[in-house]
Amino acid sequence: MKNRNMIFDFTQCYPKRKEPGLEWHDCSAIGGSRLYCSRDAEEKIKALIAPAGVSGIHFIDSGDYHYISKIMTDFIKEPFTLVLIDHHTDMQDASLGGDILSCGNWVKKVLQENPYLQKLVLIGQEKKMLDKLQSGARQQETDGKLVEISYEELKNGKAHEKIKELPDEVPVYISIDKDVLDEKYAVTNWDQGKMSMGMLEQILKTLVTEYDVIGVDICGMYPEENSLPEYLRAERVNIRSDEELYRFLQKNLFCWASHK
């Protein structure tokens, strides 16, 4: 399947100038989509994804829309590993009751609902946050599929070993929230981690050299509705980091894949 790289712009946070090879979708008219995803919004998002599937590099606005990653993985019809590089686990219980999809529970819903998921790899969260997943109830929920690589382990150089333990015959889908990065490299509307861009790119390089990659999505923009000075500063930082990630992935992702 041909790779199609897309921008899903809900908050008008992406520059209108076109980056080569990127298809821009104005999603500002999709109601019921911020933080929580209504059934109607989900169907409209699916309609944007369906023509070319999930293969490629996709920018999905702020972390308020990270649930799009769940919708993306619903299109995968083969065994796969989900790699989440994020400051948070996104494994909350539904706060509004029922089973409504949200930016805070989408990973949990992938675990519960996707029969093709083989492994879930959480990368970049603080150890104290991951420790909360170790209760008996959480262990039962994950059904032995969970692999955790804390930020502390990343700093100690242990990530490469853990990543290489994944089944090499199973392709991966990578989801990145830029809130995992230090504010030098990204400014988001969520609390952030301390990862450097160099560390993130090294993780991506390890994943792509070891495994076939189905697709990649990236969120972590800063909504324009916030204060103008802060927004303009965030815009400069985020555009720079998005451009760097896009060019890094364009240059390396499919190049490495073609040599396997």
Give residue ranges: language-model regions.
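Catalytic cores of soluble, metal-dependent hydrolases
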Residues: 2-60, 64-82, 105, 115, ...
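Short, solvent-exposed loop/turn segments at secondary-structure boundaries
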Residues: 94-99, 187-189
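A short glycine/serine-rich beta->alpha loop
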Residues: 55-59, 91-96
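Long, hydrophobic, well-ordered secondary-structure blocks that form the structural core
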Residues: 82-94, 106
